[in-house]
């Protein structure tokens, strides 16, 4: 679980880094053509600047998600807490039975079948 979360975070960081890199022109262009191409780019940058706010929100959401994952119960303690909430007359009162199915293994051991 933790490995999957780490992988998602690394992929999100790499994607954000790739999207944040500027586009480099491949060939040298005349100064007049370069100015003509820069005008739409400037307008595009002006439009995209408010878009940095959702990126900040995405970072905040990722941080909140990671905190929730760290606080989530895991392992044996969560199983023991689940057992405490069960009714004492419940059929499955053994902690080893929580979270898995035995498919009748114990019932087959309890009874001797004639062969």
From Swiss-Prot:
Entry PTM: The precursor is cleaved by proteases to produce a number of active cholecystokinins. Sulfation of Tyr-97 is essential for receptor activation.
InterPro entries documented for this protein: CCK-like, Gastrin/CCK, Gastrin/cholecystokinin_CS
One biological process term in Gene Ontology: memory
Subcellular location: Secreted
Molecular function, one GO term: peptide hormone receptor binding
Proregion span(s): 21-45, 47-63, 107-115
Site description Cleavage, residues in chain: 106-107
Residues of the signal peptide: 1-20
A Pfam family: Gastrin
Tissue: The shortest form (CCK8) is predominantly found in the brain, whereas the larger ones are found in the intestine.
SMART domains in UniProt: GASTRIN
Keyword Disulfide bond attributed: no
GO CC annotation: axon; axon hillock; axon initial segment; dendrite; extracellular space; GABA-ergic synapse; mitochondrion; neuronal cell body
Modified residues (Sulfotyrosine): 97, 111, 113
Keywords of the record: Amidation, Cleavage on pair of basic residues, Hormone, Secreted, Signal, Sulfation
Residues with the Phenylalanine amide modification: 103
Cited function: This peptide hormone induces gall bladder contraction and the release of pancreatic enzymes in the gut. Its function in the brain is not clear. Binding to CCK-A receptors stimulates amylase release from the pancreas, binding to CCK-B receptors stimulates gastric acid secretion.
Family according to the record: Belongs to the gastrin/cholecystokinin family.
Subunit structure: Binds to CCK-A receptors in the pancreas and CCK-B receptors in the brain.
Protein name: Cholecystokinin
Species this protein is from: Rattus norvegicus
Gene of this entry: Cck
């Amino acid at each position: 679980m933790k490995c999957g979360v780490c992988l998602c975070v690394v992929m999100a960081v790499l994607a954000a880094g790739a999207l944040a890199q500027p586009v480099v022109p491949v060939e040298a262009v005349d100064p007049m053509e370069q100015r003509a191409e820069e005008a739409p780019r400037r307008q595009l940058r002006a439009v995209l600047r408010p878009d940095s706010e959702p990126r900040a929100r995405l970072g905040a959401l990722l941080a909140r998600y990671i905190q929730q994952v760290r606080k989530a119960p895991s392992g044996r303690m969560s199983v023991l807490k689940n057992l405490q909430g069960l009714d004492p007359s419940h059929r499955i009162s053994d902690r080893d039975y929580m979270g898995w199915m035995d498919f009748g293994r114990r019932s087959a051991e309890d009874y001797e079948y004639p062969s």
